[in-house]
């Protein structure tokens, strides 16, 4: 093998290795038609709510709105994701969905799912909240593990 061929092969092997490093495991989800129970992954509706829990509030004391929950055992193939419990997302029902400040949303993780739950007394939406909230309804969620390209915002080498 000539020096030029060795250099070309090295570039090829390095690019192939970098391409593999730039792949990341991820999970896609789709909506299901059936309405899930409070113990299942879902978007909207009534969340899993342990009897000792409180509805999260924003910096003004206004209740946040339930967006989504993930039953962690439904997620397969992500080593860094919890294997059990429930992960919930709560947001403000404003035009920014609570993303304008760090107190307008909450992510809550329950490490165990208990049968001792209550139905939270969620206050009714006012007209503005109805207009801005991104959900209308309740949906089950199915998860599919996949591999996608990692973000290209960091260049490790130039070949």
Where does each model-flagged region fall?
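Preference for intrinsically disordered or flexible, low-complexity segments
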Residues: 1-157
């Amino acid at each position: 093998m000539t020096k030029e061929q060795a250099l070309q092969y090295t570039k090829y092997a390095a690019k192939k290795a970098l391409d593999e490093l730039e792949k990341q495991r991820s999970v896609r989800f789709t909506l299901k038609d059936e309405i899930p129970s409070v113990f299942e992954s879902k978007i909207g509706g009534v969340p899993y709510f342990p009897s000792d829990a409180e509805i999260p509030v924003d910096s003004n004391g206004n209740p946040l709105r339930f967006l989504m929950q993930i039953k962690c055992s439904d997620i397969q193939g992500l080593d860094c994701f919890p294997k059990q419990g429930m992960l919930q997302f709560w947001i403000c029902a404003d035009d920014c969905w609570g993303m304008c400040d760090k107190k307008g949303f909450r992510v809550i993780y329950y490490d165990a799912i208990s049968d001792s739950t209550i139905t939270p007394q969620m206050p009714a939406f006012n007209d503005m909240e109805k207009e801005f909230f991104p959900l209308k309804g309740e949906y089950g969620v199915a998860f599919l593990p996949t591999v996608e390209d990692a973000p290209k915002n960091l260049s490790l080498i130039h070949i």
